[in-house]
């Protein structure tokens, strides 16, 4: 199943969720305020925490996640999704970082490839799940 998101951060999170394995992804920290708890109490709390955090992978390949970004919550969205208007929005938003033209081209090529991957899945009748939040970029991406 292809997972569709509208930000790089969400893409990374869903990629991890597709292949989640609790045994391989242990980690974290526990702190306490006040008196040091007894070992038995700590053991009980850690066991409860593990149970509470137990999860299961979404399944599938982490390659089956696309980000349809294009900064659609900013500027005029009446033009082509990766046209000059979108590039101008990108330049306005990120100009302080002095991206080289090749880096900008790479970003838009990757975005175009992800859009084409979505279209291919749709044309082949494959399953697609769209993850939407109430964030403006997400709503605009869905539209």
Descriptions of predicted regions:
Residues 1-101:
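A structured, charge-rich N-terminal accessory region that forms the first stable segment of a protein
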Residues 77-80, 139-143:
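Short, conserved acidic/polar surface loops in the N-terminal third of protein domains
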Residues 95-142:
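Long, hydrophobic/aromatic-enriched structural stretches that serve as scaffold segments
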């Amino acid at each position: 199943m292809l997972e569709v998101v509208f930000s790089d951060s969400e893409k990374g999170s869903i990629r991890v969720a597709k292949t989640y394995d609790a045994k391989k992804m242990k980690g974290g920290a526990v702190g306490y305020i006040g008196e040091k708890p007894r070992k038995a109490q700590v053991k009980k709390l850690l066991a409860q925490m593990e149970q509470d955090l137990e999860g299961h992978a979404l399944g599938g390949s982490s390659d089956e996640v696309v980000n349809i970004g294009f900064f659609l919550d900013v500027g005029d969205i009446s033009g082509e999704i990766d046209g000059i208007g979108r590039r101008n929005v990108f330049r306005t938003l990120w100009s302080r970082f002095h991206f080289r033209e090749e880096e900008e081209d790479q970003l838009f090529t990757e975005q175009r490839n992800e859009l084409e991957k979505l279209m291919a899945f749709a044309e082949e009748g494959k399953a697609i799940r769209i993850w939407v939040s109430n964030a403006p970029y997400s709503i605009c991406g869905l539209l």
